Regions:
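Hydrophobic alpha-helical scaffolding
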Residues: 1-4, 42, 46, 80, ...
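Aromatic-rich carbohydrate-recognition surfaces in CAZymes
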Residues: 1-103, 126-134, 260-282, 286, ...
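Active-site acid/base region of carbohydrate-active enzymes
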Residues: 9, 15-27, 50, 57-127, ...
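Alpha-helix initiation and N-capping motif
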Residues: 12, 66, 150, 157, ...
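Catalytic cores of carbohydrate-active enzymes
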Residues: 29-30, 132-245, 287, 291-322, ...
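Active-site-adjacent structural elements in folded domains
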Residues: 35-39, 110-127, 181-191, 238, ...
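Long alpha-helical scaffolds in large eukaryotic adaptor/regulatory proteins
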Residues: 63, 140, 144-147, 280, ...
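Non-catalytic C-terminal accessory modules of carbohydrate-active enzymes
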Residues: 223-226, 239, 251, 255-258, ...
Length: 408
């Protein structure tokens, strides 16, 4: 995603490579090794194939052209099809794997690798993937219209939106998943892991959360998950849960997937707050996780990582190592934070009709200036803070509604 604004040619090459890892039924390899030549990791995750939809959509919006959708790419298990056909099969694969609650099956896991245990018997479902599907369906509907194809993507979107709000809302936030036994993970009645970050952020990113729930879910994130060094992945951290004999994770409390500040996921919180029109909170979440700021607050002796690169995670407050940065350089945080900052805080975002200018700024910023090269032109953009450029998330809206023409 972060490569696309700088070099669409390189981005096309990477997308060609990624799409070649898709199977004819629409799922993809989880890992592959084009340099080393190792055999790919073929376990099926419920989220992999949806990221490709979002990446191709971003490329099309950047270029303002449909030719890449018509390019033929081979499937991993043989035959060729257009990129557009690849994307359609990615969506169809989700619908071939729907659980008893009407949500996408978790399969081996979703974005959170720790959740592989919730679907070992094939019945666990992912609320996060339901929301990811929502965003992908909206993007597919727009692409289909541009391609001149009749489609039912928006109808599917509305149906999944109704389902996830009916079965996964827990009163103050959204559940994270269901387990094989039908029990929900990430709800108040459970003794641990009551709230999970990704279910709340993606409820907003997808547009599936009604306005009141969107605000309430993100307010719960702030209340239960935010720390001075970033937003935790879950709260409270787990120990011997759901059973001592077969816990979801063996990580200590506050470590890794078990209650750390997982940096990659923080970028989605920045985007979610921008979509709600809360620039001050979005900037707080963005700035507190900047490596130099996190290191300064934790202290060099505690942080123990470079102040100029993101780490995968930072040990959370339930650990006696709170503030220790873990696995620097190996994370999607930088790419997603770039998207969060440029397209949502600064609000300069490619759309089919041009370059949308819809900033969501913290009140202490008087103005911003941005230079953006877009479709062969160099734009220099000045925005004075306080000018009403958008109406934040309200019922029935998935993103900002323009109050006047803010696309150039």
């Amino acid at each position: 995603l972060s490569m696309i604004p700088f070099h669409t040619g390189r981005a096309r090459e990477k997308l060609d490579l990624l799409l070649s890892q898709e199977y004819r039924d629409g799922h993809t390899n989880h890992y592959f090794f084009p340099i080393e030549g190792y055999e790919p990791v073929t376990r099926i995750h419920s989220d992999n194939h949806l990221w490709v939809v979002m990446a191709v959509y971003a490329l099309v919006m950047e270029e303002g052209k449909l030719d890449y959708l018509k390019r033929d790419i081979p499937f991993y298990d043989g035959e060729k099809a257009s990129v557009w056909e690849h994307l359609k099969r990615s969506i169809d694969f989700v619908y071939q794997n729907i659980g008893t609650h009407g949500l996408p099956l978790m399969l081996h896991s979703d974005w959170n690798d720790m959740l592989y245990k919730v679907c070992r018997e094939g019945r666990g479902e992912s609320v996060m993937v339901a929301f990811m599907l929502g965003l992908a369906l909206r993007q597919m509907a727009e692409l289909a219209e541009l391609m001149g194809e009749e489609n039912d993507y928006l109808a599917r979107y509305e149906a999944m939106k109704e389902t996830v709000n009916r079965v996964a809302w827990d009163g103050e936030w959204y559940a994270r998943a269901t387990m094989d036994d039908g029990r929900f993970l990430g709800v108040k009645r459970e003794p641990m892991a009551k709230i999970w970050l990704n279910a709340q952020t993606w409820a907003v990113l997808s547009g599936m959360a009604p306005a009141q729930r969107a605000h309430q879910a993100m307010d719960s994130v702030r209340r239960y998950l935010n720390t001075p060094l970033g937003i935790k992945k879950i709260d409270p951290a787990m120990a011997d849960y759901p059973t001592p004999e077969d816990p979801l994770t063996y990580y200590n409390k506050g470590c890794g997937e078990n209650g750390s500040v997982f940096c990659h996921a923080n970028a989605w919180a920045v985007i979610a707050e921008c979509l709600l029109g809360r620039g001050e909170r979005a900037w707080e979440y963005y700035s507190q996780l900047l490596p130099m700021n996190a290191q300064a607050k934790a202290g060099e002796w505690r942080y123990k990582a470079e102040p100029y690169v993101y780490s995968s995670n930072i040990f959370g407050p339930e650990s006696d190592k709170f503030g220790l940065a873990n696995v620097s350089w190996l994370t999607g945080t930088a790419a997603w934070m770039y998207v969060a900052f440029t397209q949502y805080l600064l609000g300069v975002k490619p759309v089919w009709g041009g370059l949308s200018i819809e900033p969501c700024l913290p009140p202490q910023w008087e103005s911003i200036e941005i230079t953006r090269i877009f479709r062969g032109c160099r734009y220099h953009i000045r925005v004075k803070n306080g000018e009403k450029l958008f109406i934040p998330h309200e019922e029935g809206r998935t993103h900002y509604e323009r109050t006047d023409d803010t696309t150039i």
